[in-house]
Amino acid sequence: MSKINLTLDPPYNGEYYTGTEQISGHVSIQIEKPISIKSISIKLKGFIQTLTKIDSDQMFNNNSAMSPIQDNRAIHNIVEKSHRLFPPDNVWNALEGSHKPFKVKPGLYEYNFEFDKMPKRPECLARHKRDTDSFVKRNETRMPPSFNNNWKDMSRVDNIELYYYTLGKVIYIVQVEIELGKALAWYKPFNKFLHETLNIDYIPDAKDLIYVEDPEDYIARNSRVESDEQLIESIQNSLALNNNNNNTNNNIDNNNNRIKNKNININDGKIDNDGISTNSNTESNQVLTGDIGSNNTLMGRNNNMSVNSENRLNEHVIYKSSFSVQLPDESSVMWLEVRSRGLRHTYRRDYLFRQGSNKFDNIYLVLEGDIEEMFKMKINPRKIQLNLLEQTVYVAQGIANENVSSLRLVEALKICDDDDEFGRIFQFNPIQVPSNLHHRHHNNDAHNKKYEVELCLKDHSILKRIRFNKEDYVHRGNRLYSFKTCTIKRLFKFQLLIDWQINDKIRTTENIIDRTQIFCQVREKVNVVDTLPQYVEPPQYTETRHTTTP
């Protein structure tokens, strides 16, 4: 009867639409025989949909049989815009409320359309109730990016991992809707609609994807703010060997999803092998260094300004190993520290190990114990592996499900291929006392001191050239970006694994960079001012007359 063709103008970057551009396109309708049409409209819609399931183990109790497992669904409409293409405004206004259809002759009808820029905030906020479960505060909610656009291709029953992953989605569509005239028959009481729909990829600008950490979660999980004296004391005590720790952790199964209910404490497993003592409190593995001001506010050491939730991202953070490694003398331990200012925000094509990248360019091996016994040991770094851990959480009707997967960035790379490179990257001798403890360490016992050795991965011939997500990788149908919205949050962590040869045994250290925000955009240049080219004086010409004599 009719054929609808919907074409969108390509985005500026040729890949996805952003918040700074308008979505436009062209509609062509081929009508083969006369038809009654009431209206033709073009719509832009966006919605968030989550579906969560209760683990069957949670349905059992001692007094009753298992109840039927119910799915919990939540749908949030975040944007809806509509433009009428037919009839034109002057005709529509002249109808004065009449809903009679128009008899349209066969032929080709074409229309152009253009929507305004995407709003900054979703429309569902106006319908949020006070007790609505949400991962973000009302005043911090922004438009989310497209997520799981290709969910139909991934939600196959033969791949259970992707099936659970696609239970949360953010979809944006452009849709043509043709409302046909009402038929004059009792058995056809409703109007008929014809539709043509296209999915679009929408990713807001990086500044609109930045989410604010929950202050309570930030303090409880990610950092400790301490004065110099408190910092020294905490460094001396926080990673002490805990031989009485009987807590067991589940290993992370790479590329495997786990479903957990909201009331279950979700913890990622840590590597545990012989000779390794796992810290009972992993919350102390990160330390945000700074000074306490007169009003109990954190003061930046370099800029002497109050630090809020935004500029905390630029503070010097120490990411300690998840566990300490016991050395062969059984009285000394060692751990690894990643000291960084820039791992909170990581953009595509950022250098990871290069000097000045503020990522993994400042790494130290810290040892505590008898220095004389340490010098008798052979401690060498052998292999490095860097993983990106993805955590997606969906919530619906008070039930939350979690999915965990892993993406390998650097795979089991040898740290040192020859003696010359080994000397540049790691020298166990000489060993030095940490600079921040050198003048304040009150314990003169040489058998119970802390020492550090720099692991110069920034000088590695391969690592110093590695950029994050240089190829714009698509993981499970989505680019690499973090975001939080009403019922979906997608978070990332870096996991740094280094194998150490201690005498004749291999031990592994693990550093988790928690709550890093990942962006698929390339970092914008900062402090670059567009200026006119330097003025150059134009050349001067002199006129010379040539005369001829008769």
Curated annotation (Swiss-Prot):
Origin superkingdom: Eukaryota
Region Disordered, annotated ranges: 275-303
Localization (cell): Cytoplasm
Disulphide-bonded residues: none
Keyword Nuclease among UniProt keywords: no
Major location (coarse): cytoplasm
Annotated InterPro entries: Arrestin-like_C, Arrestin-like_N
Gene Ontology cellular component terms for the protein in this record: cytoplasm
Residue ranges, compositional bias (Polar residues): 277-303
Short name of one Pfam family: Arrestin_N
Keyword Amino-acid biosynthesis: no
Keywords: Cytoplasm, Endocytosis
A biological process from GO: endocytosis
Family: Belongs to the ART10 family.
Functional summary from the UniProt entry: May regulate endocytosis by recruiting RSP5 ubiquitin ligase activity to specific plasma membrane proteins in response to extracellular stimuli.
Protein name in UniProt: Arrestin-related trafficking adapter 10
Gene name linked to the record: ART10
